[in-house]
Amino acid sequence: MAGAKEIRSKIASVQNTQKITKAMEMVAASKMRKSQERMAASRPYAETMRSVIGHLALGNLEYKHPYLEERDVKRVGYLVVSTDRGLCGGLNINLFKRLLAEMKGWSEKGVECDLALIGSKAASFFGSVGGKIVAQVTGMGDNPSLSELIGPVKVMLQAYDEGRLDKLYIVNNKFINTMSQEPRIMQLLPLPPAEDGELKKKSWDYLYEPDPKALLDTLLRRYVESQVYQGVVENLASEQAARMVAMKAATDNGGSLIKELQLVYNKARQASITQELTEIVGGASAV
């Protein structure tokens, strides 16, 4: 059994770690609230844009934009949103497993995959396991801006425009609540039609002024950008929630470990006292 001094040292070490995890839990809780506010502020725009674009996909368009047309699938692209930091439980690895399973399905059909990575964890993971990485951006911090995301988005849209990609998806964690974050793979291009059953029953006619091509080019690009930005802010809220939960679990586990070590310490101290008493009694008997 370890000595009492060694056990006291272990208890002190766990207590110091517990202070760190508690502080990280509180910081993550504060950042999560800010991330939720940012997510809530951008969500109406993203959802409205998705609704409008969904109407367009169902409409009788005088100009059929390439982003609205299905193609034979030979290569697909994924915009993968991950975190820049760790200590957030299985948030990243669960997302990567979901993506790898989907990529395996495409591979079995003879379809190749391109990856545009957002976040250092995705860059590190796919740099190790393999995958065709065509763009990446890292170090966006806790307040990402659309200008920081333009690079990967532009690369993927250019590949789609040139016919090198036939489908484009965004991969991120969807924020459900503080305790639940869900890996999500959402198709961006070609534009999926609106899922609302009532909308599908209607025929939509639009008048475009001055030019439908110029208007749709701009509108559809804004749509993709808005969905990517929303995916990033949702992933950030998911990251902070997962980190808060992970740090709380670490703090609680530290408390349990301290109790166990305290019991071991008490037993060691009791054994030491018993041994001393035995030696004293033995010495007295010898006299």
From Swiss-Prot:
Membrane topology note: Peripheral membrane protein
One cellular component (GO) term of this entry: proton-transporting ATP synthase complex
GO MF term set: ATP binding; proton-transporting ATP synthase activity, rotational mechanism
Subcellular compartments: Cell inner membrane
Primary location recorded for the protein, binned into one broad class: membrane
Keywords: ATP synthesis, Cell inner membrane, Cell membrane, CF(1), Hydrogen ion transport, Ion transport, Membrane, Transport
CDD domains: F1-ATPase_gamma (cd12151)
Classification via InterPro entries: ATP_synth_F1_ATPase_gsu, ATP_synth_F1_gsu, ATP_synth_F1_gsu_CS
Spans traversing the lipid bilayer: none
Example GO BP: proton motive force-driven plasma membrane ATP synthesis
Domain of life: Bacteria
Complex formation: F-type ATPases have 2 components, CF(1) - the catalytic core - and CF(0) - the membrane proton channel. CF(1) has five subunits: alpha(3), beta(3), gamma(1), delta(1), epsilon(1). CF(0) has three main subunits: a, b and c.
Function statement: Produces ATP from ADP in the presence of a proton gradient across the membrane. The gamma chain is believed to be important in regulating ATPase activity and the flow of protons through the CF(0) complex.
PANTHER family: ATP SYNTHASE GAMMA CHAIN, ATP SYNTHASE SUBUNIT GAMMA, MITOCHONDRIAL
Homology family: Belongs to the ATPase gamma chain family.
Protein name listed in UniProt: ATP synthase gamma chain
Organism name: Yersinia pestis
